[in-house]
Amino acid sequence: MKLSNMLVSTLREVPAEAEIPSHKLMLRAGMMRKMASGVYNFMPFGLRVIKKIEDIVREEMDNAGAQEFLASALLPSELWKESGRWDVFGPEMFRLQDRNNREFCLGPTHEEVFTDIARNEINSYKQLPLNLYQIQTKYRDERRPRFGLMRSREFIMKDAYSFDKDYEDLDVSYKKMYEAYHNIFIRCGLECNCVEADSGAMGGAGSAEFMVKSEVGEDEIAFCDSCGYGANIEKAPAISEKFDQEELKELAKIETPNVKTIDQLIKFLEINPAKLVKTLIYKVDDKVVAVAIRGDREANEIKIINALGGAVNFEMADEETIKKATNSEVGFAGPIGIKVDCLLIDEEVTNMYNFIIGANETGYHYKNANYKRDFEGIVGDYRKVIQGDKCPLCGGNIEIARGIEVGHIFKLGTKYSESMGANFLDEKGESRPLVMGCYGIGVSRTMAAAIEQNHDENGIVWPLSIAPYHVIVVPVITKDEEQMKAAEEIYNKLKSMGVEVLLDDRAERPGVKFKDADLIGIPIRVTVGKKIKEGKVEYKLRKEEDLEILNIEQVYDKVREEFEKSSLKL
């Protein structure tokens, strides 16, 4: 394509709304434009990248034996009520009514739809295994859309669903998808790690995320520096610290006037926070729940919600609720005699001796409290792992990093097939529920993640495989007939080789052309300037600082080499 005939919408200034590199660069490079909060139009360059990623996804899914189809984005509420998720998804679901007052939603995910198709189309084990996938726009009413494509209200996603006769076959399907995802992200030029994950509202027995390490990632990941274990911090098990056994001392109430926070209590009593147990109070749907954890630990709300069997609304309790539960002012909650629907005790607390707790009385705490002797509750892992915790596999040290989730795979099991009656007849003629898997890739988020990993101060540095165009040919002076003739010859030759190539034939200053090429991130730049009189041109890779002076014929060989390095065919 010739740039003089294209919509080139580059910006020199960073839009005020953009916070992270990918968001800034996609707007500046003219990849997309904002329509509303969390809603974007893909411009020509951006759409080409999306299509490249989609093509890679399709190839790998097809190679893994999956079949593509397209489901409706407008979904009737009956399916969601049948699965029990109409209320579980909460306010993130876009809900609407038609003119006959029938309820619908814009699909945030498609488990129910695929299950409905399966129960209507699959009736025998002879039709299994089956894997269906689609690439489609999803909709979620995010409370606070931010970071461009990282957290938007509509996003392009590939979702696949496998149907098997038993869990052994599900393991096979799951492994195929794992390998396909591994291939997809390598081909997209991403450095990606697979980590254990929470299944969230999707449900199911097993789950893993494909995470791109990035400082701007919204997820925290726990990694082992010894064995390579990785898990989303929502899922990572916290290994309890072991304490030296102590003789149990007598429980005693102590006066702590005007002490309402952990920091104030530490200073007042001059103690280590590891000798404190704090009691956090939450409102979970229509219940009040208290969680007792060590004073210097942070509660893991996902673990708490999972322990309670899920929740639509989960929030810290308000002052009135706390006063009713403790008969005291805020700041003195403790596990002894607290009036709540459920008391959860972090496992680490059960290993502690003679610790400090709130007394549920204004101005007082207890010292020398001990689990079992003084209080009991539902014991479990309710805290977040931290840097330096022990790995659950090898005992090595855990490190915490931030990451961007680009893919997620689930072993759903029979959660949806049982609730929606998706059954098949097995070899014995007996009816059994289909065993399902779910596999999602954020296509638009993958685009953003690729930029986060591949950019510099001048713009995007696209991997060759997903770049909007492979090569840009830049004549320095378009009015120079010799330069333009050579540039067009190179342009046409590269096109004939199957290279996706741009010719910057705009009547712009050379500096503007170079800045646009770098900003948009075209992997290879061929510059035709004064040296064309000697049959020479400049050849430069976007990812490298240095350039080479080559004969024109050498350019074609260099381009072929670059394709081979990226495992791309011409």
Curated annotation (Swiss-Prot):
From the record, give the cysteines joined by S-S bonds: none
**CDD domains the record matches:** ProRS-INS, ProRS_anticodon_short, ProRS_core_prok
Question: In its keyword annotation, does this UniProt entry include DNA-binding?
Answer: no
Query: What PROSITE patterns does UniProt report for this protein, alphabetically?
Result: AA_TRNA_LIGASE_II
Reactions catalysed, as given in the entry: tRNA(Pro) + L-proline + ATP = L-prolyl-tRNA(Pro) + AMP + diphosphate
Q: Which keywords accompany this UniProt record?
A: Aminoacyl-tRNA synthetase, ATP-binding, Cytoplasm, Ligase, Nucleotide-binding, Protein biosynthesis
**A Gene Ontology term for the protein's cellular component:** cytosol
E.C. designation(s):
6.1.1.15
**What remark about domains does the record contain?**
Consists of three domains: the N-terminal catalytic domain, the editing domain and the C-terminal anticodon-binding domain.
Question: Would you identify the family this protein belongs to, as annotated?
Answer: Belongs to the class-II aminoacyl-tRNA synthetase family. ProS type 1 subfamily.
What protein name is recorded for this chain? Answer: Proline--tRNA ligase
Organism from which the protein derives: Clostridium tetani (strain Massachusetts / E88)
